[in-house]
Regions:
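Pepsin/retropepsin-fold aspartyl endopeptidases
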Residues: 1-123
Length: 123
């Protein structure tokens, strides 16, 4: 076993796994989605988390209908739990449709999604 500690996960009303994190020192509520290839942050929170864009916008496919505009960020500081600290790039994408669905089912809003890219690189 490595020296990293475990991070407490919460189960939402919709049975999604949630965790609290800090991104560039700011608190974030993140949904854990093993089916999401990339970790992402709600584009409206770019300034709040002090995220810097990298590259040009692109069309991203997801669970919603059609494609959505997205842009990558430079790596930023992320902290999960008390001791895990690392760097992570995110996809900035509009998550209003995700939050609307969660809200309609009585669940809390999320700031972003931890995807398979993060999970694979931080086994």
């Amino acid at each position: 076993m490595n020296s990293r500690s475990f991070t407490k996960l919460n189960l939402s009303k919709t049975k999604h796994l949630l965790c609290k994190a800090k991104i560039n020192g700011k608190t974030a509520k993140l949904l854990i989605d093993t089916g999401a290839s990339n970790s992402c942050i709600h584009s409206e929170l770019k300034e709040y988390f002090n995220l810097k864009e990298k590259g040009d916008p692109f069309d991203a496919a997801g669970a919603s209908e059609g494609k959505m505009q997205a842009v990558m960020t430079l790596e930023c500081k992320i902290q999960l739990g008390r001791s895990f600290k690392g760097n992570q790039a995110f996809v900035l994408i509009d998550l209003n449709h995700v939050n609307a669905t969660l809200n309609s089912q009585g669940a809390v809003r999320i700031d972003g999604i931890i995807g398979a890219d993060f999970l694979k690189s931080n086994k």
